[in-house]
From Swiss-Prot:
The lineage of its organism: Eukaryota, Viridiplantae, Streptophyta, Embryophyta, Tracheophyta. GO terms for cellular component: cytosol; peroxisomal matrix; plasma membrane. It comes from Avicennia marina (Grey mangrove). Heme binds at Y348. The active site is at H65, N138. This is Catalase.
Length: 492
């Protein structure tokens, strides 16, 4: 018998209802009782099975990015980048690759309004011929911290107070006051882009520095940028309050309705490329996630376009069970020594195993669309039918062999084991540059948001003074305005 012929699927529905075991159900409206009013019998397995499944329908919520919307489409190469990478899906202009994208808010719970000030997730899974490739990014190009040992702490600070379950700005600003590298990310967070109008009008960034390797073995650092062809649009606070008060799923609905109407959203993918031999030329560390690579020095290189032209068929199967991880790379693309990236490689796969189980990569939305083979057997919810007798490698009885070798970074790394901060911190220059690039009205809105946040009565004078000092080092004029509005002096 074909083991896959009768796998559960909506295409194999019966004309009548059944139990999960396939038994016909002649009455799904009444429990089995003794008489018309008697007690319900424990032997009513139809009822027990239905209730037991219902009470287990929910799975653990994502610890971050719980609220999300998903769509499917394709990526098409539009420019030749084969001199930069040997990645098969980027081999030539015109090559198309199917993909799925998940947009999300970061901090708030599943079901929370999509109008809250919060970073947005921008995660893309490419189903390539060499396996899946995930770019797990955000709508900000930088992050609040540079070392992932503080990641649980920064998320705890942004999450609701464990006592009251209320998100409070004093907790955020207290924690981040110890980390001046967060200043540049706050220059996005409290900027207009802190509340995107919807997902279609939102940029995406890979945040981390990866490496590209070409066929000759040449390695370059790379950053990924997604630019929406319909432009970037944001919500002001009054608009966010009005929209969020009537539709807490406005961004999800906008994405779904646009695709259903044939108005397919599109983004252009760009690379920023840096030769590792040149990284010491800069006054910042290129592998620091709290820094951008200035585009006037390292310009954007066009690569291709992403088009989302199909809505998902089932929210749970293609959104809740969808799993991304930065460790999903393909030949021609590799990691850098970015501290945040190095630890996310472990953390994301680990949280998926907790949330979905050890066989989460067997779920259809996560499984590669190419042929694959390994000796990962058994485990909870392993529904793959396998009939091999050899479950080890190597073997004289199994022709499986190693894949053809592909180029990987081979830089020699030396150093002393230690817990240290990076040498080039430069925590203030880029934040000041960003602020000075804005028009006066945008600067005023940014100032007002900082004043509102720092006016939280739980914040001490010391913490307010620290932030005034940080911004005074980034831009003297802004620091003076902030100090004047708050009636405080900087501590530095």
């Amino acid at each position: 018998m074909d083991p896959y012929k009768y796998c559960p699927s909506s295409s194999f529905n019966t004309p009548h209802t059944t139990t999960n075991g396939g038994h016909p159900v002649y009455n799904d409206n009444s429990s089995l009782t003794v008489g018309t009013r008697g007690p319900v019998l424990l032997e009513d397995y139809q009822l027990i099975d239905k209730l037991a499944h219902f009470t287990r329908e929910r799975i653990p919520e994502r610890v971050v990015h719980a609220r999300g919307a998903t769509a499917k489409g394709f990526f098409e190469v539009t420019h030749d980048v084969s001199h930069l990478t040997c990645a098969d899906f980027l081999r030539a202009p015109g090559v198309q690759t199917p993909l799925i994208v998940r947009f999300s808010t970061v901090i708030h719970e599943r079901g929370s309004p999509e109008t809250l000030r919060d970073p947005r997730g921008f995660a893309v899974k490419f189903y390539t011929r060499e396996g899946n490739f995930d770019i797990v990014g955000n709508n900000f190009p930088v992050f609040f911290i540079r070392d992932a040992i503080k990641f649980p702490d920064v998320i705890h600070a942004f999450k609701p107070n464990p006592k009251s379950h209320i998100q409070e700005s004093w907790r955020i600003l207290d924690f981040c006051s110890h980390f001046p590298e967060s200043l540049l990310t706050f220059a996005w967070f409290y900027d207009d882009v802190g509340i995107p109008q919807d997902y279609r009008h939102m940029e995406g960034f890979g945040v981390h520095s990866y490496t590209l390797i070409n066929k000759a073995g040449k390695v370059n650092y790379v950053k990924f940028h997604w630019k929406p062809t319909c432009g970037v649009k944001c919500l002001m606070e009054d608009e966010a309050v009005r929209i969020g008060g009537t539709n807490h799923s406005h961004a999800t609905q906008d994405l779904y309705d646009s695709i259903a109407a044939g108005n397919y959203p599109e983004w252009k993918l760009y690379f920023q490329i840096m030769d590792p031999d040149q990284e010491d030329r800069f006054d910042f560390d290129p592998l620091d996630t709290t820094k951008i690579w200035p585009e006037d020095i390292i310009p954007l290189i066009p690569v291709g376009r992403m088009v989302l032209n199909k809505n998902i068929d089932n929210f749970f199967a293609e959104n809740e069970m969808l799993a991304f991880s930065p460790h999903m790379i393909v030949p021609g693309i590799n990691f850098s020594n970015d501290k945040m990236l190095q630890t996310r490689i472990f953390a994301y796969g680990d949280t998926q195993r907790h949330r979905l189980g050890p066989n989460y990569l067997l779920l259809p939305v996560n499984a590669p669309k190419c042929a694959y083979h390994n000796n990962h057997y058994d485990g909870f919810m392993n529904f793959m039918h396998r009939d091999e007798e050899v479950d080890y490698f190597p073997s004289k009885y199994d022709p499986t062999r190693h894949a053809e070798r592909h180029p990987i970074p081979n830089a020699v790394i030396t150093g002393r084991r230690d817990r240290r901060v990076i040498e080039k911190e430069d925590n203030f220059k880029q934040a000041g540059d960003r602020y000075r690039s804005w028009a006066p009205d945008r600067q005023e809105r940014f100032l007002r948001r900082w004043v509102d946040a720092l006016s939280d009565p739980r914040l001490t004078l010391e913490i307010r003074s620290i932030w005034v000092s940080y911004w005074s080092q980034a831009d003297k004029s802004f620091g003076q305005k902030l100090a004047s509005r708050l009636n405080v002096r900087p501590t530095m």
